[in-house]
């Protein structure tokens, strides 16, 4: 009887220990997956900005959009993408838009740079686990702006094709707190 009681106590302790290990493993896996999702989203954003191309685009109804148009929670930019063709890879300019609102980060890309009405877009959710976001833009004189092109861009002689020197992204993750990235644009150093 004593042996059975000792065995039962040891079995209960072993079960409790195994249960704790499994719960810890699940928590680590969930944190790892969440961090991986943030890393992929930031890498996609950095890749788009590193391929920024200093060329304005024509909107669907004939409006001219600057090479980059952005505010505190969205950004549209002309980027160069590598496309496969019969003669080999070639660089093609496309328009990419990042929209960060209501805890969702969407990346939208159009197949053409100068749009016609009803040009199809490809939208993809790249992150959905954050509580706050802000974008800021750094000009050639190292001044910060909440929008790009700056409100006084025409008075300062800034061309619509001018890109900022850098873009700062501040993202508040529900799990990891504030994440801040400052991305330099090579095309912005003119």
Whereabouts are the PLM-identified features?
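Extracytoplasmic beta-strand-rich oligomerization domains located immediately C-terminal to a leader/signal peptide
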Residues: 11-116
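Intrinsically disordered, low-complexity regions enriched in Pro/Ser/Thr/Gly and acidic residues
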Residues: 80-163
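Short, conserved beta-strand segments of beta-strand-rich sandwich/propeller modules, principally
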Residues: 164-168
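N-terminal signal-anchor/signal peptide hydrophobic helix marking the start
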Residues: 1-7
